[in-house]
């Protein structure tokens, strides 16, 4: 008998007390939370439910922020590129940036912490050759080289918390005060924040869980003068800086800091950039310092008899949950927003906490809950997409956020959430405490490794980008597939070549000369030799997009010999190419029902002699396979997430690992239906991922099979 209560968190507000109690019963919620812009009703403190209180370590105390303007949080910003036409060039610092969001920091030594760069040469402009005119807000370069480009990198105070600004703009809030972001890392605010936290805990005895949002630096989020989003990087570190922090960094690493280590030519070290040594040093420093201070807060929380939960997002930069420092914080739980399977695994794969929680969509905001809105559609898509990943690695709880009042006019939505809550509880009871059956071990190889586990190709949280959906689809497919998935970096291979011995298949996915494929790391023969040796001795390799892409020593794809495919960059147009014959009857394509969707695909890819082309379009290879020694490789130009493409990736992994013989084990012949086996628990489930009825043949672990018809979205549980 499945549980009918528990493992669910519900939001509330002062104006929905009876409705909260009613929905707690319907949804089986055992925890209640507040949200940004809401207050917790006293009446609900006596319900017996666990009470979460959202706690902002860096805002919601403007009195302190205004009294200590020197300890307001800061961000490194680079101006646009400006071309000099004569010896003098004036560059406006705040052009394109909301002056409600940021204010130029002139309090600290600008000649020490700012940087003017000649972008035509990459050279630093001497500090004697420029000055800042505060009345105009411009840096004036007095000895510019005509027709060279210049930029200014400067520090700015974050005078309106970016998340508060986003919430205010999205919800059209009126008559409110902008919340200023203060820096808990700095001495006065550090001391004050610990006292403030202890006082809060003492004044809120009814609160069981402090839901920290978060520790302590906002991911990079900038808005322009029209309050439109200008720049976003969910992993961005550029708002985790101050002279105080940077001086500490200098002492630790033993070399002087440069703004360019953060600015990175205006790319701000986004995850497509191959990270520099200096940036990796800075990340490591931030991880240690953030963990140290976060632990102080968690210790106070525990002393006050409460649990400490961290929200995975907003001011989370430096926590890095997949790195060793995270466990030292001592958190009880992590909660994060679930946008798809990948972002579910971002939460559920975190170690070092007692439980994890996923906040599901839609968020109860007016952008979804309005007269013509369809929250049921969004909720269905969110649940069905995330469910695949939950079945591989369950979170321990689910919840929702926002304004509960908005949902009350949508009875179908309330019913659907009730169904989801019941289904989740059943799923959790059946899957908990065991690792589901894994066919093979797969390693995603890039410059970042485990620090960006499940977040590869993600610019903003789970949002579509035309330029990367063909690659992000690989990660999404893996999030719910029966593989043991790990994320390794090129540095990992250099430090420990034996790391590949436990792996069946390596996947390298992305555009050339990005961190996802490696860039100039391929000039190091230790890397290319290690991968070749791995495959030659029987390993599998799957390359998607421009794997190992970097022009060097006669190749663009540095593993072209292994992959059997190369890119025509123009340098080899003089060579004729004769291998264009397609082989559609391959194991990998056996379940396809239509032409393969490669998303954006890739132009100008051709195959070497001996390579077996599975799909080429207008003499551009989209999919090919190759034998290399005892091993095998698969090339795919792109693979957006879909159920059919998920099956293609599944078969690609099996084929590259010589695993064709294990295909019919815990397997569904219909790719819209998937099988997950929990052998230790003696159970397996079959899940219909679509909104239509499905028919399929299900294979058990011993190869025996049975026919099955399934209702839309249905999940069926069986004993092994």
Please provide the spans of the model-predicted regions.
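Boundary/entry segment of secreted carbohydrate-active catalytic domains
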Residues: 1-23, 27-30, 160, 164-174, ...
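Catalytic domains of carbohydrate-active enzymes, especially glycoside hydrolases
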Residues: 9-10, 15-50, 196-213, 326, ...
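Hydrophobic targeting/anchoring helices
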Residues: 44, 62-65, 197-198, 208-215, ...
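Polysaccharide-binding and catalytic clefts of secreted carbohydrate-active enzymes
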Residues: 69-328, 346, 432
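Short helix-loop-beta junction
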Residues: 462-487
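Short amphipathic alpha-helix with an adjacent loop that forms part of the alpha/beta core around
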Residues: 494-501, 523
């Amino acid at each position: 008998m499945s549980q009918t209560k528990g493992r669910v968190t519900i939001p509330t507000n002062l104006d929905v007390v009876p409705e909260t109690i009613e929905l707690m019963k319907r949804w089986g919620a055992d925890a209640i939370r507040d949200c940004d812009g809401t207050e917790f009703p006293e009446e609900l403190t006596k319900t017996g439910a666990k009470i979460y209180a959202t706690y902002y370590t860096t805002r919601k105390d403007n009195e302190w922020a205004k009294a200590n303007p020197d300890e307001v949080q800061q961000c490194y910003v680079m101006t646009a590129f400006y071309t000099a036409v004569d010896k003098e060039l004036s560059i406006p610092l705040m052009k394109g940036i909301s002056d409600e969001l940021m204010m130029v920091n002139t309090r600290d030594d600008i000649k020490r912490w700012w940087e003017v760069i000649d972008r035509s040469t990459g050279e630093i402009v001497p500090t004697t050759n420029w000055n800042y005119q505060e009345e105009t807000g411009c840096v004036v370069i007095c000895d510019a080289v005509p027709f060279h480009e210049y930029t200014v990198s400067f520090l700015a105070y974050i005078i309106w918390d970016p998340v508060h600004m986003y919430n205010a703009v999205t919800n059209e809030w009126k008559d409110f005060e902008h919340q200023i972001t203060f820096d808990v890392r700095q001495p006065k605010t550090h001391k004050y924040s610990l006292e403030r936290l202890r006082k809060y805990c003492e004044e809120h005895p009814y609160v069981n869980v402090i839901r920290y949002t978060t520790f302590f630096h906002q991911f990079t989020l900038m808005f322009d003068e029209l309050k439109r989003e200008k720049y976003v990087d969910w992993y961005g570190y550029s708002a985790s800086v101050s002279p105080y922090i940077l001086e500490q960094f200098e002492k630790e690493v033993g070399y002087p800091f440069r703004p360019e280590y953060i600015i990175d030519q205006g790319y701000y070290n986004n995850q497509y950039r191959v990270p520099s040594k200096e940036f990796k040093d800075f990340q490591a420093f931030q991880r240690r310092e953030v963990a140290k201070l976060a632990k102080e807060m968690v210790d106070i929380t525990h002393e006050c008899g409460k649990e400490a939960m961290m929200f995975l997002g907003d001011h989370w930069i430096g926590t890095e949950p997949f790195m060793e420092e995270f466990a030292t914080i001592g958190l009880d739980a992590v909660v994060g927003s679930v946008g798809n399977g990948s972002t579910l695994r971002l939460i559920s794969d975190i170690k070092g906490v007692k439980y994890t929680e996923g906040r599901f969509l839609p968020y109860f905001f007016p952008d979804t809950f309005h007269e013509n809105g369809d929250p049921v559609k969004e909720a269905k898509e969110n649940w069905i997409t995330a469910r695949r990943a939950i079945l591989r690695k369950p979170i321990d709880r689910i919840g929702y956020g926002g304004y509960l009042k908005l949902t009350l006019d949508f009875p179908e939505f309330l019913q659907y959430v009730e169904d989801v809550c019941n289904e989740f509880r059943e799923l959790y009871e059946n899957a908990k405490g065991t690792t589901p059956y894994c066919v093979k071990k797969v390693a995603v190889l890039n410059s970042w490794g485990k620090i960006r586990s499940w977040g590869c190709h993600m610019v903003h949280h789970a949002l579509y980008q035309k330029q990367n959906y063909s690659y992000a689809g690989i990660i999404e497919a893996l999030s719910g597939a029966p593989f043991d998935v790990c994320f390794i970096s090129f540095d990992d291979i250099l430090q420990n070549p034996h790391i590949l011995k436990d792996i069946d298949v390596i996947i390298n996915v992305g555009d050339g000369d990005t961190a996802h494929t490696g860039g100039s790391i391929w000039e190091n023969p230790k890397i290319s030799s290690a991968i070749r040796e791995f495959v030659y001795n029987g390993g599998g390799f799957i390359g998607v997009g421009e794997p190992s892409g970097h022009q060097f020593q006669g190749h663009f794809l540095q593993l072209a010999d292994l992959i059997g495919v190369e890119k025509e960059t123009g340098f080899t147009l003089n060579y004729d190419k004769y291998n264009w014959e397609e082989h559609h009857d391959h194991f990998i394509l056996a379940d396809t029902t239509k032409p393969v969707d490669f998303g954006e695909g890739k132009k100008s890819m051709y195959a070497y002699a001996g390579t077996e082309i599975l799909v080429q379009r207008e003499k551009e290879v989209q999919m090919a396979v190759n034998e290399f020694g005892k091993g095998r490789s698969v090339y795919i130009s792109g693979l957006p997430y879909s159920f059919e493409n998920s099956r293609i990736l599944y078969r690609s992994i099996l084929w590259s690992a010589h695993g064709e013989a294990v295909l019919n084990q815990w397997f569904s012949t219909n790719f819209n239906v998937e099988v997950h086996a929990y052998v230790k628990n003696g159970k397996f489930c079959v899940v219909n991922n679509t909104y239509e009825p499905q028919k399929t043949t299900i294979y058990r672990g011993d190869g025996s099979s049975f026919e099955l018809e399934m209702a839309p979205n249905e999940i069926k549980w069986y004993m092994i």
